[in-house]
């Protein structure tokens, strides 16, 4: 097909150990060639195709995880994107659990990335959905943390496992002492809350 799933590795910084991967969709367009998510995801969010794309990615990732498991890599997690449209779908929990059960995988092998901006749309419903997903065993990651919105308030209310820092937030860290201090504060806060931290870039 025109869509493929690529895996971007995640490394543990203290020992450079491969700790997992992030699944990213790529579109090989017949006219325009290889397109990155930034070039087509906004369009898919508008026309509703994003839910079909996400489900395709989830299925492909679970299929790959099962193949890796058979080769002895049973503790290798993969992060997948969950769009705002998916989050507010009434059957997302049932759909995700059915996919991991189909491939006989533990839910914690699938890390679900939810953007920080999703919190501002309907925080009450989002918290309910995320709580249900965590109860089922999925690992919840907040993507693009620090990109704005009510970051600290969200941390106080959202049942999450991982903070994924926004790239702009990290890049600006090198510019000014104040920004470095803010970054260190966020990392220290995450540690106190027993959250893992992922830095993009």
Spans of features found by a protein language model:
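Catalytic-site/binding-pocket detector for metal-dependent nucleotidyl cyclases
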Residues: 2, 48-49
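Conserved acetyl-CoA-binding loop-helix of GNAT-fold acetyltransferases
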Residues: 53-56, 179-185
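The catalytic core of metal-dependent phosphodiesterases that act on cyclic dinucleotides
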Residues: 97-173, 185-201
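Catalytic core of bacterial c-di-GMP phosphodiesterases, primarily the EAL and HD-GYP domains
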Residues: 13-22, 49-126, 200-201
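Residues at alpha-helix caps and immediate loop-helix transition turns in enzyme cores, especially N-
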Residues: 19, 36, 91-93, 122-126, ...
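Active-site core of bacterial EAL-family cyclic-dinucleotide phosphodiesterase domains
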Residues: 1-43, 81, 142, 199
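Conserved long alpha-helical elements within nucleotide-processing catalytic cores of c-di-GMP signaling
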Residues: 38-42, 51, 127, 131, ...
């Amino acid at each position: 097909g025109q869509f493929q799933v690529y895996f971007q590795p995640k490394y543990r910084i203290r020992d450079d150990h491969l700790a997992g991967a992030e699944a990213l969709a790529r579109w090989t367009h017949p006219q325009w060639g290889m397109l990155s998510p930034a070039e087509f995801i906004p369009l898919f969010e508008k026309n509703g195709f994003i839910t079909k794309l996400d489900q395709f990615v989830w299925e492909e990732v679970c299929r790959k995880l099962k193949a890796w498991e058979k080769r002895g890599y049973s503790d290798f997690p993969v992060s997948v994107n969950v769009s705002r449209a998916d989050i507010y779908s009434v059957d997302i929990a049932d759909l995700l659990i059915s996919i991991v059960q189909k491939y006989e995988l533990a839910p914690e092998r699938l890390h679900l990335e939810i953007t920080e901006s999703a919190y501002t749309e309907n925080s009450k419903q989002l918290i309910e959905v995320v709580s249900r997903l965590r109860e089922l065993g999925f690992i919840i990651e907040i993507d693009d943390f620090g990109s704005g919105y009510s970051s600290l308030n969200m941390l106080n209310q959202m049942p999450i496992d991982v903070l994924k820092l926004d790239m702009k937030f990290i890049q600006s860290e090198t510019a000014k002492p104040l920004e470095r201090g803010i970054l260190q504060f966020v990392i220290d806060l995450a540690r106190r809350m027993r959250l893992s931290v992922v830095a993009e870039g």
